[in-house]
């Protein structure tokens, strides 16, 4: 019985001394991995909901990038795209205001 307790204690201590981490923290619905610095082929995501904390980025490997294209696309904001987006928003708002609901009487 003493040898069993000793063996258990040794394994518990060795688990604390392992240089690597047996638990790799995942992010973005288990697609990405939390790292301090992403590799050149990986896409990094700096969103607060990615659950990596302030010091780490969510790194998504290139082979898994197709699973979440909306989050892993590098976008460039230019002046023309901003103007186009504002124009689209104004047109959408104007068309929605013209679709005001008409009152319907409950008696039919």
Swiss-Prot record:
O-glycosylated; glycans contain alpha(2,3)-linked sialic acids. One of its GO terms (cellular component) is extracellular region. The keyword Metal-binding does not apply. It is found in: Secreted. One of its GO terms (biological process) is defense response to Gram-negative bacterium. The keyword Secreted applies. Disulfide bonds join 27-58, 34-52, 38-59. Residues 21-63 are annotated as: In vitro binds to LPS, mediates antimicrobial activity and inhibits LPS-mediated inflammation. Residues 1-20 form the signal peptide. Keywords: Antibiotic, Antimicrobial, Cleavage on pair of basic residues, Defensin, Disulfide bond, Fertilization, Secreted, Signal. InterPro entries: Beta-defensin (IPR050544). Homodimer or homooligomer; disulfide-linked. Highly glycosylated atypical beta-defensin involved in several aspects of sperm function. Facilitates sperm transport in the female reproductive tract and contributes to sperm protection against immunodetection; both functions are probably implicating the negative surface charge provided by its O-linked oligosaccharides in the sperm glycocalyx. Involved in binding of sperm to oviductal epithelial cells to form a sperm reservoir until ovulation. PANTHER family: BETA-DEFENSIN 123 (PTHR15001:SF3), BETA-DEFENSIN 123-RELATED (PTHR15001). Belongs to the beta-defensin family. This is Beta-defensin 126. The lineage of its organism: Eukaryota, Metazoa, Chordata, Craniata, Vertebrata.
């Amino acid at each position: 019985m003493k040898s069993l307790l000793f063996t258990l204690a040794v394994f518990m201590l060795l688990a604390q001394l392992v240089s690597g981490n047996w638990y790799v923290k995942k992010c973005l619905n288990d697609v990405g991995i939390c790292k301090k610095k992403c590799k050149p082929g990986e896409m990094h995501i700096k969103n607060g909901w990615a659950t990596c904390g302030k010091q780490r980025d969510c790194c998504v490997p290139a082979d898994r990038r197709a699973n979440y294209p909306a989050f892993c696309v590098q976008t460039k904001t230019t002046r023309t795209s901003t103007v186009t987006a504002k124009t689209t928003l104004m047109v959408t708002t104007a068309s929605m205001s013209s679709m005001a609901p008409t009152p319907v009487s409950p008696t039919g």
